[in-house]
Amino acid sequence: MGQGESTPLSLTLDHWKDVKTRAHNLSVEIRKGKWQTFCSSEWPTFEVGWPPEGTFNPSIISAVKRIVFQETGGHPDQVPYIIVWQDLSNSPPPWVPPLAKIAVASGQDNGRKSAGGRPSAPSRLPIYPETDSLFLLSEPPPYPTSPPPPPAPHAARPAPGLMAEGLGSEGPAAGTRSRRPRSPTGDTGPDSTVALPLRAVGPPAEPNGLVPLQYWPFSSADLYNWKSNHPSFSENPTGLTGLLESLMFSHQPTWDDCQQLLQVLFTTEERERILLEARKNVLGVNGAPTQLENLINEAFPLNRPQWDHNTAEGRERLLVYRRTLVAGLKGAARRPTNLAKVREVLQGPTEPPSVFLERLMEAYRRYTPFDPSSEGQKAAVAMSFIGQSAPDIKKKLQRLEGLQDHSLQDLIKEAEKVYHKRETEEEKQEREKKETEERERRRDRRQEKNLTKILAAVVSEKGFRGRQAGNLSNRAMRAPREGRPPLDKDQCAYCKERGHWARECPRKKNARETNVLTLGDQGSRGSDPLPEPRVTLTVEGIPTEFLVDTGAEHSVLTKPMGKMGSKRTVVAGATGSKVYPWTTKRLLKIGQKQVTHSFLVIPECPAPLLGRDLLTKLKAQIQFSTEGPQVTWEDRPAMCLVLNLEEEYRLHEKPVPPSIDPSWLQLFPMVWAEKAGMGLANQVPPVVVELKSDASPVAVRQYPMSKEAREGIRPHIQRFLDLGILVPCQSPWNTPLLPVKKPGTNDYRPVQDLREVNKRVQDIHPTVPNPYNLLSSLPPSHTWYSVLDLKDAFFCLKLHPNSQPLFAFEWRDPEKGNTGQLTWTRLPQGFKNSPTLFDEALHRDLASFRALNPQVVMLQYVDDLLVAAPTYRDCKEGTRRLLQELSKLGYRVSAKKAQLCREEVTYLGYLLKGGKRWLTPARKATVMKIPTPTTPRQVREFLGTAGFCRLWIPGFASLAAPLYPLTREKVPFTWTEAHQEAFGRIKEALLSAPALALPDLTKPFALYVDEKEGVARGVLTQTLGPWRRPVAYLSKKLDPVASGWPTCLKAIAAVALLLKDADKLTLGQNVLVIAPHNLESIVRQPPDRWMTNARMTHYQSLLLNERVSFAPPAILNPATLLPVESDDTPIHICSEILAEETGTRPDLRDQPLPGVPAWYTDGSSFIMDGRRQAGAAIVDNKRTVWASNLPEGTSAQKAELIALTQALRLAEGKSINIYTDSRYAFATAHVHGAIYKQRGLLTSAGKDIKNKEEILALLEAIHLPKRVAIIHCPGHQRGTDPVATGNRKADEAAKQAAQSTRILTETTKNQEHFEPTRGKIKPRELTPDQGREFIQRLHQLTHLGPDKLLQLVGRTSFHIPNLQSVVREITSKCQVCAVTNAVTTYREPGRRQRGDRPGVYWEVDFTEVKPGRYGNRYLLVFIDTFSGWVEAFPTKTETALTVCKKILEEILPRFGIPKVLGSDNGPAFVAQVSQGLATQLGIDWKLHCAYRPQSSGQVERMNRTIKETLTKLALETGGKDWVTLLPLALLRARNTPGQFGLTPYEILHGGPPPVLASGEVVGSNGDFFPVLFTHLKALEVVRTQIWDQIKEAYRPGTVAIPHPFQVGDRVLVRRHRSGSLEPRWKGPYLVLLTTPTAVKVDGIAAWVHASHLKPAPPGAPDESWELEKTDHPLKLRVRRRRNESTA
């Protein structure tokens, strides 16, 4: 037969499966159609000699590859196909013909000649095909080309094909990363088995030059192996850190290789942390880490640098970069200091000590900032190693002598000795086996010894009885009687015949034997076996003989006799344990009876066994007689009931149980309230009621009462009087009595309104159990119950006589002669603490009952008791003991409400039956009778009543969701069909409420969770055999933030929400969470764009708990099957859903698009002349594209959004790069915009977010450009690159746009001023002593600082020599100022809004001054912001009425109506009274920023000044009466020069301070100008200087200087918690050490910040020595005491 010619193309198509496998191994994908098209049509057009039928010639394939890989004009879509062709050429498969292989080999050898012109050795095929890098499809970086190798002697010119393979730097393949076949010889290149990025390609070009390096990038296989064979950096950073450290110093990667390693091996967050830590470790010129940005960018650039690895400088840069990157890796691997993590590292049972030490040191490196290998930490590591080692090693190491002198190596040696001396597992098993055998041998020997003794006793007894006739008590043998002939051996002693003995003589009558069972009796069986009790039963129609074995728990068959079940049981025997199966139900016939039973199948059993299980079921009886044991069955006659058909319903009626068995009433007559009367707890002391510290008696008049109501409660009051529970009294306390009519009767019961008393009584923590989870502690196995209700429980506790007057009430009964007040002698009802007090008292009294009766469980809820037991007998016994205990303690039980020893009881509104809880019919009827609501309050009442039953209603939150909006008061109430439908569905669900199992705390729980329409729904279950029983149905609505998340994240919130509710029932037991999402992976690697760190930490603390586990995702579970409106959720992958719902536009980029114009946007907002101006602009590098001013008050964030939105609109249909320096605008466009849209643009509080309209406009405009990239750039940079220049231009254009529409008018100051015509005042000279005395008295009067005191003295008519030095000396020595004044804080002064004349703008604030005087506890302070004039008024309360009164009585008459009032958001200022007064007077009341006292800085500073002045005056006068000292403090405040050297008095009144108005301070008379001239002088100053200076804006301050404290200085330290009239500073202390920011002082252990220190005044010593007596008469104690009398 003929055969057609095969071509390379036909061969590949015939073996296409192998070709496709080869492509898959190369990590590329190819198609059969394109393969044929490229080979036959495309590649022949390249004109490189490619035939249409294909070829395996390497040179032709390389030529095609060069064209495909060209940077310009290349063919990226053909890259995978030519790569596979080249791989088939380099590694021919078996189906390639031999001629083709020879052609391939010859093509590979072409041009490869040796230096002498001889051909090189033939190429050897590689074992594994080399895989090309995954990065072949991306554009390669511009790596510097390697230098050519040095010329070798007689070297032949390389072939052109070899040049094209990459050794040359020209041609279309220059700069590509293609992998060519490597030469097998070692002469032409490095070893191909080592993937070094930089490889030496030959000797250096110069004698002392560098070895040239050639770049080879990492292969994808290397990266994949490193990624897959090492744990993630977050789990265990040691592996990747060690890998990269070895790669850095062995493979010499370039900058791009380092970025590739970071990109592949680390996550984004890990990579950013590593780069940040690395930049922190860049070393400066001094060898220490530097903070200079230029040095950091130079040594560790974030963008690709132009480093040439073939130069010395380039290699040095790469070396520094690698070292810094390794330091960053180690820094990022370090976790926050957590010594608890170190203590958790314990040695495993089989872990070698050296491995454990390595794990321990790694924990030190990760969780502490210490280096465990340093000398200073070796002791700590050694102690941890000893304490956390295995018990045997720890015991050995702790016994070492001189433990502190042993090194870690010594400890390791000792630990290794103990470790290697341990038994192996085989040795341990062998030893245990030998010990077991030895114990068995000893037991066998002991049993044999005992048996030998028993047999010896039996034998000796037989011998003794046989010798009684002639040998007793070791006497000699008796001689035969005379006259009786001797007997022969075979002669009978009875008949004298031969042939038998006497006991066998037939003539002898047998004597009657005594029925005594002894071993020697004739009637014993001896060694004969006892008769075995056996019975024959018919099993599945086959008669089977069973051996009755009462010691066997289960009945046994030796053969299955039918189908086997799945149940297995472990049977432990003498030879070990083995698992045996069970049969299914088998039918047994026993006489006329038929029963079904499961048998245990044991083939090794000698006979079928009838065990206790089947004997019990058959009610068998075993009788033992002389004939043997007999087994009989109970056989009762059948009974039938004949009745009429119409009477059959009586069989199904539920019998009405009697209230209580009369026998209980007779057994315990003193415990029933109906027989014994009122109870009294005899072991509880009288209750004392504690009042609040500020409580005062309250008397509330009695409400009017109808005659019917009074007559209705009179019998109850009289009964309590007769019993002594009520007694007459006279008390300042009085509360009203309310008669409440009992439903369905004409009887009334008295109820006392104790609300006013409850307000004045101290609160105690309520310890009453929560009825929601009280039943969780009731085991489901306890199905017999008794319920007791204590009668008049609170009246069982006595009330202390001192507390009785608190509960007095008014009562008038003229017929009985009672007129006045009555009060309770027992604990009253209506008192808020009565339930807690009674619950605790009863709990203490019944503590002994709980301890002595563990067989029952008793639950207590105030006065309701529940006793539960597994059996009726235990329940009855426990109830009897409880009644005895209650009778002895003095409590009384209601016989009408008692439920004793029942399987079904009602407790706390639940119906308990069979280990389950049900809703009572009365509870259901209550909800069903609720009419349709008509008001929001009625809706809330319905939801509250139905919410009690929500555990029984699946998906209650979903059903009630339409009703929740109607519960709001201010929302219009409109009842629609949807509301009526929800109302009806809740009632229908209540009627079909299922039974819920009681939680069994010995079993784990399973929580099924699902989320639909923002509602979390779940089912809490527990297993019962193969089924899961529901314990509770849970449902809850998610908060507004979580409701806007993707479905997968909403499931996380739902699980966390329901898990907290389930914990109330599970009480900390293990919970298995089952949901239709992969929750565990999301929780462990949460998306950082959707939720905050605080919320994610909260979820992880709840869900990543050792008691919470996650099951695989289940699309269908009981929670997903709960009723909903629609369910069309598809199966999905959570990670993909989260990725899809993150961005606002799929192709939006944060990196610049190449070849696209760039725009720069910016928004500006600033305050000018008290108004906030704003503008926005868009510029490019040449012109302003758009600029506009924005409305007054626009914030900077809003301006940035407007600028970015406008840029997107202007770029409609274009490709554009938009730069912005706003993080807010950038994050909104890339991340937060989609999140806001998902949430409905709501905050976590359910309110609209800020800039809502601008964000919506941005989200719409972001889709207008054809292609867009929004890039964030740093703002206000000084560089010359285009980005920094464009950003500065945009900022300038925005500022200009903000001011573009403002009309600036130039105002000139009034140059006219008063010229004095009488000259200046001539100052009076004072002597130095007079000047010092004057300054001293002036400072004692004002306690001003040096600068203010200088200004004040400078305005007097006195001249004092050396004024500055005298003032500073006196102020520095003042002890009162030193311990009171605060340190000047170096802050930049800000701008504040002020009035333009006195009395226009006031600031007001309350401040508390302790201790209060004359009832005044507060100080109301007013300050005029223009002049600084202060008004302060002591007040008793901090109310709005006080503020309004002072404004109307003090401010209004003296200063006129203010235009503006500023205050904080205190209740007194935001009240309707204050705001209403401001509205009526036309005052603009400005409320300052909340929690920002700086916004009320002027009045806050004045509060501090007044308090400091009061403190100084109180210290000097020795009193605490600050109300009396307040005028002096106001005098000081009003006469203190301000910023411009003027006092508030001068600004307001135009005159000098009153303290300087007289010249008699010194005591001499001088020639002074009259007072009128002084006033005129002041008027001139006011008109010319004062007001204009005050209107000037603040000037920025100077930069703060380092602290001046040195070692040896004496300083004062700030008190952080000083009182109102206590000094602020303590000390002095001696400075020991200093740093640029902190100081170490003697006497304080911690370092003190320099801002909390001030120099101590010279004078008093800082310490003194005292002598103290001791107990010893010849010893004295010398104690150093620090002087802090002023502190």
Swiss-Prot record:
Protease: Most efficiently inhibited by Amprenavir, which is able to block Gag-Pol processing in infected cells. Its EC number is 2.7.7.49, 2.7.7.7, 3.1.26.4, 3.4.23.-. It catalyses: DNA(n) + a 2'-deoxyribonucleoside 5'-triphosphate = DNA(n+1) + diphosphate; Endonucleolytic cleavage to 5'-phosphomonoester. Residues 544-614 form the Peptidase A2 domain. Residues 139-153 have a biased composition (Pro residues). Its cofactor is Mg(2+). This is Gag-Pol polyprotein. Mg(2+) 2 binds at residues 1162, 1200, 1221, 1291. The record marks 128-129, 196-197, 455-456, 517-518, 1310-1311 as: Cleavage. The lineage of its organism: Viruses, Riboviria, Pararnavirae, Artverviricota, Revtraviricetes. The RT polymerase active site binds 2 magnesium ions. A motif (PTAP/PSAP motif) lies at residues 108-111. Mg(2+) 3 binds at residues 1405, 1464. Keywords: Aspartyl protease, Capsid protein, Coiled coil, DNA integration, DNA recombination, DNA-binding, DNA-directed DNA polymerase, Endonuclease, Host cell membrane, Host cytoplasm, Host endosome, Host membrane, Host-virus interaction, Hydrolase, Lipoprotein, Magnesium, Membrane, Metal-binding, Multifunctional enzyme, Myristate, Nuclease, Nucleotidyltransferase, Phosphoprotein, Protease, RNA suppression of termination, RNA-binding, RNA-directed DNA polymerase, Transferase, Viral genome integration, Viral matrix protein, Viral nucleoprotein, Virion, Virus entry into host cell, Zinc, Zinc-finger. The active site is at 549 (protease). SUPFAM superfamilies: Acid proteases, DNA/RNA polymerases, Retroviral matrix proteins, Retrovirus capsid protein, N-terminal core domain, Retrovirus zinc finger-like domains, Ribonuclease H-like.
